[in-house]
């Protein structure tokens, strides 16, 4: 059958009817199958205004079905070569079909809730009472002069998955972005995180050094803030990055993706897990993606190969456990030893063979669609070596030599030479996807899904790159990490026809993730000098299991009022078989504590949708969340199963008691000895400085002996904290000192902290809960334009990562509160198809958002989890698209207006750590008090989550030869970024990007292009070029200074049979 409409047409869907199913519908409708449409139907259908341009008859009928809100089944082959003059004016549905088909041999016949296209026949009606404008009475006998043979058909009108996803961006009263199956497969790139490129306002943290996605939406990122679900299942693991913070990893195989929707901000959307930042909703392949229209069985084979790859030169880990003296001598540099099997010169651009065969992928899918059931089986594999970086635009990253700066970025290109291999970037991914759908009745659906993915990939702890030696030894190549993830889900839908009370959905699911990753903090090979044994202190093992239930029901209370009820339950368990302290205290300090704990979360929500008139709608609802969590590792530690001397920080809580500050004054009187010595020193100073006025308080500090004798009375100021270790600006002791009028000097100028170590006596269960409302309204200003506004609150309850002791942060004294987000958004949407007579899509959307999150969970400057007062984010987003079949484009721009973090306690601590300075007004802090700072405070996580101030994504293309050939190009721009901590030369920040200071990047343009050709109904070939300008760059939000892939060419072949 001819493929109809390869472009993305608005409001069009393709789903299949088997011949048997269609025949059953036809028989059930009796004589309606062969009779022309009559006015009786027109009386029940609304009249609408249409302006459909001339074109191929199949396309015109499709557009009419879309705009009228119905569906029509047709055999596209029967319409080949037929054209239509279009439709303009006011018509009911039946009148419109009659007008479009009046000069053809076809008519449209109503079948159930839709229509089917049938050849016209001349019925003989044996009754003198039948009128031309009415249906025949039941006594009439109808005979056909000719019968119509039913052929495989395609039903148009109802949207398919991808069309619905793209349209929802402009139809929903909220912000989102969508990528369909073709787009994901075309631009899936080198790393899994590449599937998010091109989505406005959406990024992934540490894209090149994680093998996973760490979603960021409108600057909101982190564990639990932007949940990622795959077919309704959730899997997320927090991973330590040493001095460079934490990753929120979501492992996914791009070869299984059928569509990605990113929802921006909290939402009460049905059967969707969102949080304070929104959600990433991933759907995997279905039988509809594989079985050809009108067929019952189908298979798809996809193979592809890419350039710019080379097999990694992996170290031999069999030496672990051997005596160092029995191995190849290690490299001795600057008093340290380096394993030559790990530290080796990286391959150069001359080793980059364009057709090496080191990046190959394939996918085989087999499916069947029957009346009662569907089955799908998919196997996908991709093996890719290390990639090579680009060569152009490296000047920004080559502004200093390694021995002249502790700032990584200015000499980044010395470590990663442009065009050279980037170690630790390889991947071997293998997946299975099995789905079975059973339809016991027309009202019920039961779907069972199983997904299994093995991912063996390269990564390195960012702080182990050892920047000072990489130009000489090369970037170390570590062994590969290993992830095995499984997911199971059972979905049930029940939607009785003509029942306004029941539209029920339930999903029971589980994910299991086994991790063996090089994220523990040590080294893959190091020497245990107690016995000279080579040991591996970098590998970490963990198991994460999540079990969940999601249920919802939608009820139509009135014709204008819907109520949706929903609820969910999540149970999570994290375990590890790592033995903390197995190599003694000298190594345990470099290793992460093995987190272990349990957590449960429950939600309940309701949402009303009210449509009082056709141009106005309202949404109002609330969500309740509750949780509890318990730290199993801490509990085990407190039972004396782990020696606390290895790391006492996890058995004690730190609480700031006070800051003390010393200053000196003149004593009320000097001792006789002091007075004699001062007199002698005064005389000497006066002799050398005849202009001296003789006053002791004007003796400069350079006369240190006399100066110290004069100011010999030591005094102490104290800035006391409250019972929870929090400081108040009103208690600033310098204000009191300056107001006293007392003469004093300061020789040190630094405040000293006094911290109480409070023993942890028990690992108690922590819990919390909260209700959050959401409101929205939309107004259609014209039939083609509307405005909307929404207000959404949301709670994010502390994650298991924030509820357990382990890597990256110490135990907090005060219990962590839930984050509470307040999100505001207004938007304007305009459908411009009236401007373009041949447009399938022509939309523009402008949105403004302002998000404030109170009690945002963060790591403070003392590396302790705490609640910041608030974070404020705001920005503008523009999205647009156009498609007329021959030409299409999709353009989007994001401009961030504000990213501000506010916290009184952090601001005071930052001010104190900056030191003091003497001024004419007295003693003052060198840095002024600043409650709100851009991006975040030093040593925290938020400061590394800043996104580009300005970004642009553009896609444009054209179709030729009856849309068999498609050519397209994509451009992506990120504005340069440098953290305010760097720009302001913050004295409290350690040089060299220590303790989570974000990396900078230059203005970045990335250009991609593709050519897709449909050889015949069964075969498609596609060429894709990524980073065509061969740019040398790093990705935004990266925590690991690793160059991105250079120019890469991919060819793929897909066949369906």
Swiss-Prot record:
Effects seen without this gene: In a mouse pulmonary infection model, the mutant exhibits reduced bacterial lung burden, and is virtually undetectable in the spleen and blood. In a systemic challenge, the mutant is avirulent.
GO cellular component: cell outer membrane
Residue span(s) of domain TBDR beta-barrel: 296-1057
Claim: Oxidoreductase is one of the keywords in the record: no
Annotated membrane topology: Multi-pass membrane protein
InterPro entries for this protein: Plug_dom, Plug_dom_sf, Secretin/TonB_short_N, TonB-dep_rcpt-like, TonB-dep_rcpt_b-brl, TonB_rcpt_b-brl_sf
Main location: membrane
Induction: Part of the hemO gene cluster.
SMART domains attached to this UniProt entry: STN
Compartments (UniProt record): Cell outer membrane
Record's keyword annotation contains Acetylation: no
Family the UniProt entry places it in: Belongs to the TonB-dependent receptor family.
Protein name: Hemophilin receptor
Species of the source: Acinetobacter baumannii
């Amino acid at each position: 059958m001819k493929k109809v409409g390869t472009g993305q047409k608005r409001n069009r869907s393709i789903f299949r009817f088997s011949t048997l199913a269609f025949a059953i519908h036809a028989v059930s409708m009796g004589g309606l199958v062969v009779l022309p449409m009559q006015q009786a139907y027109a009386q029940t259908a609304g009249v609408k205004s249409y302006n459909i341009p001339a074109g191929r008859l199949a396309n015109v009928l499709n557009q009419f079905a879309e705009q009228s809100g119905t569906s029509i089944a047709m055999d596209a082959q029967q319409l080949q070569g037929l054209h239509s003059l279009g439709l303009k004016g006011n018509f009911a549905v039946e009148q419109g079909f009659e007008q479009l088909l009046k000069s053809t041999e076809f008519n449209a016949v109503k079948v159930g809730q839709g229509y089917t296209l049938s050849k016209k026949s001349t019925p003989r009606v044996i009754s003198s009472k039948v009128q031309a404008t009415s249906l025949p009475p039941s006594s009439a006998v109808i005979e056909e002069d000719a019968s119509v043979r039913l052929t495989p058909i395609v039903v148009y009108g109802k949207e398919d998955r991808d069309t619905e996803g793209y349209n929802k961006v402009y139809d929903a009263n909220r912000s989102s972005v969508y990528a369909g199956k073709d787009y994901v497969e075309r631009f899936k790139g080198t790393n899994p995180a590449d599937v998010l490129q091109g989505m406005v306002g959406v990024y992934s943290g540490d894209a090149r050094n994680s093998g996973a996605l760490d979603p960021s939406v409108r600057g909101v990122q982190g564990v639990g803030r932007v949940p990622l679900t795959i077919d309704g299942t959730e899997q997320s693991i927090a991973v330590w990055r040493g001095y460079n913070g934490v990753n929120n990893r979501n492992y996914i195989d791009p070869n299984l993706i059928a569509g990605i929707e990113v929802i921006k901000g909290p939402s009460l959307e049905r059967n969707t897990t969102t949080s304070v930042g929104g959600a990433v909703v991933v759907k995997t392949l279905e039988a509809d993606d594989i079985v050809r229209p009108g067929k019952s069985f189908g298979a798809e084979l996809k193979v592809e190969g890419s350039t710019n790859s080379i097999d990694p030169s992996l170290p031999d880990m069999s030496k672990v456990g051997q005596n160092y003296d029995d191995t190849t001598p290690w490299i001795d540099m600057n008093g340290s030893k380096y394993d030559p099997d790990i530290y080796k010169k990286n391959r150069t651009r001359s080793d980059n063979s364009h057709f090496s065969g080191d990046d190959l992928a394939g996918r085989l899918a087999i499916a069947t669609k029957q009346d009662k059931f569907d089955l799908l089986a998919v196997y996908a594999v991709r093996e890719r070596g290390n990639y090579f970086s680009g060569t152009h635009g490296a000047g920004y990253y080559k502004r200093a030599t390694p021995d002249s700066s502790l700032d990584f970025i200015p000499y980044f290109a010395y470590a990663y030479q442009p065009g050279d291999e980037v170690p630790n970037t390889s991947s071997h991914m293998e997946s299975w996807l099995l789905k079975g759908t059973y339809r016991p009745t027309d009202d019920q659906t039961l779907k069972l899904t199983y997904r299994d993915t093995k991912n063996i990939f390269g990564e390195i702890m960012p702080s182990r790159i050892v920047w000072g030696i990489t130009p000489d030894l090369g970037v170390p190549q570590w062994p590969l990490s290993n992830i095995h993830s499984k997911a199971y889900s059972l979905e049930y839908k029940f939607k009785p026809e003509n029942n306004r009370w029941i539209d029920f959905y339930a999903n029971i699911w589980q994910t299991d993730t086994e991790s063996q990753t090089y994220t523990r903090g040590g080294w893959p090979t190091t020497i245990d000098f107690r016995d000279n044994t080579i040991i591996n202190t970098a590998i970490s093992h963990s198991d994460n299991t999540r079990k969940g239930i999601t249920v919802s029901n939608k009820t139509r209370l009135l014709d204008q009022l819907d109520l949706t009820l929903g609820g969910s339950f999540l149970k999570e368990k994290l375990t590890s078989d790592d033995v903390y302290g197995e190599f003694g205290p000298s190594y345990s300090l470099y290793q992460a504590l093995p987190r272990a704990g349990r957590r449960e979360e429950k939600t309940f929500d309701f949402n009303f949708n009210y449509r009082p008139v056709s141009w106005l709608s309202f949404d109002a609802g609330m969500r309740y969340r509750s949780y509890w969590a318990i730290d199993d590792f801490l509990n085990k530690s407190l039972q004396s199963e782990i020696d606390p001397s290895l790391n006492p920080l996890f058995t004690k809580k730190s609480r700031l008691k006070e800051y003390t500050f010393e200053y000196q004054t003149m004593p009320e009187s000097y001792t006789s000895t002091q007075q004699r010595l001062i007199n002698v020193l005064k005389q000497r100073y006066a002799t050398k400085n005849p202009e001296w006025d003789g006053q002791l308080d004007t003796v400069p500090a350079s006369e240190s002996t006399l100066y110290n004798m004069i100011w010999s009375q030591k005094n102490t100021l104290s800035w006391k904290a409250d019972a929870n270790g929090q400081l108040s600006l009103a208690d600033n002791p310098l204000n009191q000192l300056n107001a006293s009028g007392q003469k004093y000097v300061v020789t040190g100028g630094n405040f000293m902290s006094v911290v109480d170590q409070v023993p942890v006596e028990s690992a108690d269960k922590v819990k919390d809960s909260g209700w959050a409302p959401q409101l929205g309204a939309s107004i259609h200003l014209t039939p083609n334009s509307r405005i909307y506004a929404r207000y959404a609150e949301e709670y994010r309850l502390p994650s298991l990562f924030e509820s357990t002791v382990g890597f990256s942060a110490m135990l907090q004294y005060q219990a962590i509160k839930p984050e509470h987000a307040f999100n505001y958004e207004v938007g304007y949407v305009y459908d411009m198809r009236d401007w373009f007579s041949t447009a399938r899509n022509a939309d523009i959307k402008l949105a403004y958002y302002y998000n404030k999150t109170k009690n945002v969970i963060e790591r403070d400057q003392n590396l302790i989890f705490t609640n910041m007062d608030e974070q404020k984010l705001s920005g503008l987003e523009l999205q647009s698209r156009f498609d007329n079949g021959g030409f299409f484009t999709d353009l989007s721009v994001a401009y961030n207006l504000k990213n501000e973090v506010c916290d009184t306690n952090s601001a005071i601590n930052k001010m104190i750590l900056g030191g003091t300075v003497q001024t004419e007004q007295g003693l003052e802090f060198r840095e002024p008090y600043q409650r709100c700072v851009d991006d975040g405070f030093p040593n925290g996580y938020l400061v590394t989550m800043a996104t580009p101030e300005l970004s642009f994504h553009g896609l444009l293309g054209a179709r030729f030869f009856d849309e068999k050939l498609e050519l397209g190009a994509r451009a992506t721009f990120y504005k340069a970024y440098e953290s305010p901590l760097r720009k302001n030369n913050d004295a409290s920040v350690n040089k060299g990007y220590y303790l989570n200071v974000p990396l900078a990047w230059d203005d970045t343009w990335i250009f991609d292009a593709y050519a897709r050709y449909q050889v015949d109904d069964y075969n498609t070939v596609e060429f894709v070029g990524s980073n065509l300008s061969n740019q040398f760059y790093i990705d935004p939000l990266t925590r690991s200074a690793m160059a991105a892939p250079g120019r890469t060419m991919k060819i793929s072949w897909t066949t369906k049979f």
